[in-house]
UniProtKB/Swiss-Prot annotation:
Residues annotated as site: Reversibly protonated during proton transport: 59
The entry's keywords: CF(0), Hydrogen ion transport, Ion transport, Lipid-binding, Membrane, Mitochondrion, Transmembrane, Transmembrane helix, Transport
Subcellular compartments: Mitochondrion membrane
Entry's Gene Ontology cellular component terms: mitochondrial membrane; proton-transporting ATP synthase complex; proton-transporting two-sector ATPase complex, proton-transporting domain
Subcellular location, principal: mitochondrion
Membrane topology annotation: Multi-pass membrane protein
Gene designation per UniProt: ATP9
Function according to Swiss-Prot or TrEMBL: Mitochondrial membrane ATP synthase (F(1)F(0) ATP synthase or Complex V) produces ATP from ADP in the presence of a proton gradient across the membrane which is generated by electron transport complexes of the respiratory chain. F-type ATPases consist of two structural domains, F(1) - containing the extramembraneous catalytic core and F(0) - containing the membrane proton channel, linked together by a central stalk and a peripheral stalk. During catalysis, ATP synthesis in the catalytic domain of F(1) is coupled via a rotary mechanism of the central stalk subunits to proton translocation.
Segments crossing the lipid bilayer: 14-34, 52-72
Subunit composition and interactions: F-type ATPases have 2 components, CF(1) - the catalytic core - and CF(0) - the membrane proton channel. CF(1) has five subunits: alpha(3), beta(3), gamma(1), delta(1), epsilon(1). CF(0) has three main subunits: a, b and c.
The name this protein goes by in its record: ATP synthase subunit 9, mitochondrial
Length: 76
């Protein structure tokens, strides 16, 4: 029983590695937004909604990884 519990915790820990990718993706999105707005401030209204969409898509992958880790801990 202890071996199964340890395997669940190890699997949940490994599945949270995807959160690292989400964090890097969000950083890249907003770095590109800052770079674009600093080059041409008049495009702020055009670039900001695209940045929010990129943020949402990057964050969704992180939330899926977090959901899998919770499923491994509590449901399996």
């Amino acid at each position: 029983m202890q071996l199964v519990l340890a395997a669940k915790y190890i699997g949940a820990g490994i599945s949270t590695i995807g959160l690292l990718g989400a964090g890097i993706g969000i950083a890249i999105v907003f770095a590109a937004l800052i770079n674009g707005v600093s080059r041409n401030p008049s495009l702020r209204e055009t670039l900001f909604p695209m940045a929010i969409l990129g943020f949402a898509l990057s964050e969704a992958t992180g939330l899926f990884c977090l959901m899998i880790s919770f499923l491994l801990i509590y449901a399996v």
